[in-house]
From Swiss-Prot:
InterPro entries: bHLH_dom, HIF-1_alpha, HIF-1_CTAD, HIF_alpha-like, PAC, PAS, PAS-like_dom_sf. This is Hypoxia-inducible factor 1-alpha. The gene is hif1a. GO terms for biological process: cellular response to hypoxia; intracellular glucose homeostasis; positive regulation of DNA-templated transcription; regulation of transcription by RNA polymerase II; response to hypoxia. Disulfide bonds: none annotated. It comes from Xenopus laevis. In normoxia, is hydroxylated on Pro-404 and Pro-560. The hydroxylated prolines promote interaction with VHL, initiating rapid ubiquitination and subsequent proteasomal degradation. Under hypoxia, proline hydroxylation is impaired and ubiquitination is attenuated, resulting in stabilization. Contains two independent C-terminal transactivation domains, NTAD and CTAD, which function synergistically. Their transcriptional activity is repressed by an intervening inhibitory domain (ID). Residues 629-648 have a biased composition (Polar residues).
Length: 805
């Protein structure tokens, strides 16, 4: 028992010794490792306060990249560095807006400058030794690999290949080490010469190993990475060689800084609405395509150096930092803000590279008002032979200023006589508000010559065929005073406008548009506002003889226009076909046909004007609505003469028939002339023939009569004839019956238009009473207000509605 206890005690002691020995060995290894890393950290070209705080992983990464950095450093000419260069080395990083980055062919970052912390938020030692692909956006990896790939060229071009230039666009690097929440910042990679990257092959003389073999060359890429600032973070004012611009999404200027004028020569207003591609040098257009593409994909870009065309020739070297501004509401691109750095003066000023640089396009035209005093200048005695036309021919732009406007006075000037020259210094042509002058001096002042503003001598031109010896000037004086003072030209010449030779008819009003412009008569009538006022008023004064030739009277043009919204199936004059006339009506109708259609009926060959006037008086005194009615009822209410939308019968197509035939099954109702007039007299009211001449208010007829009194088509007059017993029945049959038609296929209505002469004739015939001036819309829509005893009642109304439908 005791022996077993002794054995177990020995085992325990031995195990403790082994553990202690292992701890001592581990402690010794750690101490040795620490000593090794301490020595390695001191081997690094870093300050003691920096190297003493490095961890083992950082020391290993830095020591691993140190030989590569030494190779890059040995490739440079360090022996030629002066004392001044050594003093300025500390200021280079302060002046540099970015950081220096050295990449190997595999993408390892073997060196970064100390100021990388200001740009990326990561220290120099946290990034050194890592791969650049760990800190860039995945979308930029392929582009970076393409830049890092070195391709050997032919032997004769090997020297050029050793310094291969490649344009480097922007790339993005995240600014913290959190892999779950990365934030990227756009940086631009640029090389030491013209902002292009140089992939250099460093081949030292002592590049042989211990065995005598030559080491492979060290290939690396040295770039300068500059972060692109956001426009909101730019410090203002900008540099004197910098101007700001804003563009739309299609790269058209929407704003430009005024500093562009002194740098490039363009005015800001000249660039607005123009594309920025118009000002790129043709050789740089392809290089700028990719940066503009990256601008929309990454949000920011730096174009690198390119040539921008100057205004008057040549170009300047420019570098642009472009930023896409997004809408805060929908995150859509809104505009592009560019900060343009002009890097040089205008190069090759005499070289024209674009049509926009030509003087004929870009030189602004001087104002025409400035040239006006140069035209009206004094003619010296030795220059009298010089013609005014030659002066105006040298400056054709001034002729456009001399063209008159609507309403201007046209005053021809006589250049042959100068005896009656008078100074015009005291005569005010215009006052402060460009109104007619009220000076009395114009009444006694001739307006024929127009002198220079400061000289009393007028213009003279003896040989001036192109201007027809007239000069059009603009004057806003009293027309009566001006016309009275023109004593060198006739009244007709004074009122003729300045027109071409093919002008045939002069205008009669000096203030109308056709006085200054050769316009069509229909277009000119639109400008005559006084005629519009006359349209809504009746003038009892006769302006022209009451004469309407048959060939010029177009009934279709006289028909009222009815919109589609008001296109109801209303009764019109041609549907009132149930009335029948006796044998005396065709005779009267024949006389009216003879009066208005002289060339159509063969019986009018012996017609005379005296008979026509006598027949006209007889017809006006006889209140008869004469018409020839059709018995053939069309199927559709909108076809034929039944429809109110159908065109009236032309006079040339009408043939007067003196016989009337009734449709089979329709009884003939002969109505004497005196009873038919009684019906019309009964329907009329004294209020019917009273009207107002108000042009704004719509005139309505207060009557209970039919549509005969509506539009002045067909005349209804009052006579003292006793009404017949069948007048009410006959009138109802006129309004409601479609079956009682006459057999004629055409209808003729006597038209007495509401013109001035018609008003005068009616006033003379009926003791001052006149008919109301109404439109077709009033006739067919307005219903009688009172006198309902003559309206359809009961079964007759239902029968009329059935026939209308």
């Amino acid at each position: 028992m005791e022996g077993s206890v002794v054995v177990s005690e020995k085992k325990r002691i031995s195990s403790e010794r082994r553990k202690e020995k292992s701890r001592d060995a581990a402690r010794c290894r750690r101490s040795n490792e620490s000593e090794v890393f301490y020595e390695l950290s001191h081997e690094l070209p870093l300050p003691h306060n920096v190297s003493s705080h490095l961890d083992k992983a950082s020391i290993m990464r830095l020591d691993h990249q140190l030989p590569a950095v030494e190779k890059v450093a040995d490739a440079g000419d360090l022996d030629g560095e002066t004392e001044l260069d050594k003093q300025l080395n500390c200021f280079y990083l302060k002046a540099l807006e970015g950081f220096v980055l050295v990449l190997t062919e595999e993408g390892d970052m073997i060196y970064l400058s100390e100021n990388v912390n200001k740009c990326m938020g990561l220290t120099q030692f946290e990034l050194t030794g890592h791969s650049v692909f760990d800190f860039t956006h995945p979308c930029d990896h392929e582009e970076l690999r393409e830049m890092l790939t070195f391709r050997n060229g032919p032997a004769k071009k090997r020297k050029r290949t050793n310094h291969r230039e490649k344009f480097l666009p922007s790339y993005e690097m995240y600014i913290n080490q959190s892999w779950k929440n990365r934030e990227y910042k756009v940086s631009h990679m640029e090389g030491p010469s013209l902002y292009r990257t140089h992939a250099c092959i460093y081949d030292n003389a002592n590049n042989q190993n211990h065995c005598g073999y030559k080491k492979p060359p060290m290939t690396c890429m040295v770039v300068i990475c500059e972060p692109i600032p956001h426009p909101s973070n730019i410090e203002f004012p900008l540099d004197s060689k910098t101007f700001l611009s804003r563009h739309s999404l299609d790269m058209k200027f929407s704003y430009c800084d005024e500093r562009v004028t002194e740098l490039v020569g363009y005015e800001p207003d000249e660039l607005l609405g123009r594309s920025v591609y118009e000002y790129y040098h043709a050789l740089d257009s392809d290089h700028l395509t990719k940066p503009n593409y990256n601008m929309f994909t990454k949000g920011q870009v730096t174009t690198g150096q390119y040539r921008m065309l100057a205004k008057k020739g040549g170009y300047v070297w420019v570098e642009t930092q472009a930023t896409v501004i997004y809408n805060s509401k929908n995150s859509q691109p809104q505009c592009i803000v560019c900060v343009n750095y002009v890097l040089s003066e205008v190069v090759e000023k005499d070289l024209i590279l674009s049509l926009g640089q030509t003087a004929s396009v870009l030189i602004p035209v001087e104002s025409q008002e400035i040239k006006m005093p140069e035209i009206f200048t004094e003619l010296n005695e030795e220059n009298n032979s010089e013609c005014l036309f030659d002066k105006l021919k040298q400056e054709p732009e001034s002729l456009t200023v001399l063209a008159p406007d609507a309403g201007d006075e046209i005053i021809p000037l006589d250049f042959s006589s100068g005896d009656s020259d008078k100074p015009y210094e005291d005569v005010p042509l215009y006052n402060d508000v460009m109104l007619h002058s009220t000076s009395n001096k114009l009444e006694s002042t001739p307006i024929t010559p127009l002198p220079a503003p400061e000289m009393p001598k007028p213009l003279r031109s003896n040989v001036d065929p192109a201007l027809n010896r007239e000069v059009v000037i603009k004057m806003e004086s009293n027309p009566r005073t001006t016309c009275a003072s023109i004593h060198h030209s006739t009244a007709i010449q004074a009122r003729q406008p300045f027109r071409y030779q093919f002008q045939s008819e002069p205008s009669t009003e000096p203030n109308t548009p056709e006085y200054c412009f050769d316009v069509d008569s229909e277009m000119a009538s639109e400008f005559k506002l006084d005629l519009v006022e006359k349209l809504f008023a009746i003038d009892t004064e006769a302006k022209a003889p009451f004469y309407y030739p048959g060939n010029d009277l177009d009934l279709e043009m006289l028909a009222p226009y009815i919109p589609m919204d008001d296109d109801f199936q209303l009764r019109t004059f041609d549907q009132l076909s149930s009335l029948e006339c006796d044998s005396s009506i065709p005779q009267t109708l024949g006389s009216m046909t003879t009066l208005f259609h002289q060339s159509l009926s063969p019986s009018t060959s012996d017609f005379k004007p005296e008979d026509a006037m006598s027949d006209l008086k007889t017809i006006i005194q006889s209140p008869v609505h004469m018409m020839k009615e059709s018995t053939s009822a069309p199927v559709s209410p909108y076809n034929g003469n039944r429809s109110r939308t159908s065109s009236p019968v032309r006079p040339a197509k009408a043939v007067v028939d003196k016989t009337e035939k009734s449709r089979p099954g329709t009884p003939n109702l002969p109505v004497p002339l005196n009873k038919r007039c009684t019906i019309l007299d009964e329907e009329l009211n004294p209020k019917m023939i009273c009207f107002t001449q108000c042009t704004a208010e719509k005139r309505k007829m207060e009557s209970d009569g039919p549509l005969f009194q509506a539009i002045g088509i067909g005349t209804l007059f009052q006579t003292n004839v006793d009404p017949g017993p069948n007048s009410s029945l006959q009138w109802k049959r006129v309004k409601g019956s479609d079956s009682e038609r006459l057999s004629s296929a055409e209808q003729r209505t006597i038209l007495l238009l509401s013109t001035d002469m018609a008003s005068q004739l009616l006033g003379q015939s009926f003791d001052g009473t006149v008919l109301p001036q109404l439109t077709g819309y009033d006739c067919e829509v307005n219903a009688p207000v009172h006198g309902t005893r003559n309206l359809l009642q009961g079964e007759e109304l239902l029968r009329a509605l059935d026939q209308a439908n």
